[in-house]
């Protein structure tokens, strides 16, 4: 399908074909069977554990930086985070294609086993200090990127964590879309996405507390265990037919899913399965709503990722909090504010969508714009009575985009390529977003400490940041700049979205 072709609606696609029923209008609101809610609960639980595992590294980063046996720099922590995200993104298209062709529950359960085992192994990675160190000089900006053998080993293990998380995050949204009809989809995705701030929050708390009492190595080993156990629940999930909630016949057949066997692999000649991967990728990239929303979310992800990695270190090093208090405080804030923003964003978007066809873009744009001021407040203020409330407000507003963005992502592409659409989105938002921002902030922090980037340091001083002492906070000024870019792109998407949203068969 080229960008100039008008996608067929459900009604057009089935007209004249007696064996296919007409599409269900959105206002018919078919009932959602109980099994769909059970499946959502299982998938959300594992996603919750996924983000606990991911967030343990930022939670214990300060302990690792202060461990004399490791001798890590800020840049090393950034490289570890980037390595996870790069493996996450490189493999996303592969898992997206597999998810469009094979039973998804089995793939996702296998993914949970991989990332959980790799998380536990991270606690032993510093034993592989025999790995060589690497140095790369960038003459254009006069920076040398250096990484020790220990840091390289840690990067390798974190990359394995990214392999498992890539498969799970890529495939799961398409399965949820087949469990829930359009009028409940954004809310369901909001529940699933709410596991992200909740996992982030508990990752801070659990990682920080375990590191305080047992050390950072034990923290990694223990948090990997629950994912291995819950993978069994995902393996046993029964799948609905693809596109099950898009037509009346499929909506009724969804009620039988609890008693049905898991979906069998589709034959090569089934709809969309014989389309080449390159044609599928082009089909998705030429979809305007998908492209603009992904660009906006990439900038938002860059800002969120930078804070997710460096927030604890900033609170301890630049704000003066102790590490355990910082982890617990940020964990509670992220849990309450993140869940509020994610649930609220899905709820708000579904209701505004009844009146405005571009509601999802507007909710993303307005919430991101509103989040810029409290984000700056977190960086500039040194008084906890100011920067902690600003943190709560910023997290709430920035997570509001989660559910409406994913609804745009899924509704803008054909049903048969949803997993690939999510995979491509993952590639872009991480490879061009937080994989870069997390590492860049670490490199900038080390460079500012050495007296480089005088212009950035001068700007930081002008707005009240002590750039000489708070070099990590200064480096994090990249975050509000990224939010401004994100806001602009979401408003562009709202302006360009002329026709009503609809599910696309394919």
Residue ranges and their predicted role:
Residues 113-147, 368-382:
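C-terminal ends and interior cores of transmembrane alpha-helices
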Residues 57-58, 287-343, 398-402, 406, ...:
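Extracytoplasmic gate region of multi-pass secondary transporters
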Residues 218-235, 474-492:
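Symmetry-related core transmembrane helices of the 12-TM Major Facilitator Superfamily/SLC fold
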Residues 81-97, 332-345:
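Central cavity-lining transmembrane alpha-helices of secondary-active solute carriers
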Residues 192-242:
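Helix-loop-helix hairpin linking two adjacent transmembrane segments in secondary transporters
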Residues 108, 154, 358-364:
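Primarily marks hydrophobic transmembrane alpha-helices of the MFS/SLC 12-helix fold
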Residues 29-32, 246-294, 318:
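Juxtamembrane intracellular "pre-TM" segments in multi-pass secondary transporters
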Residues 155-198:
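Cytoplasmic helix-loop-helix junction between adjacent transmembrane helices
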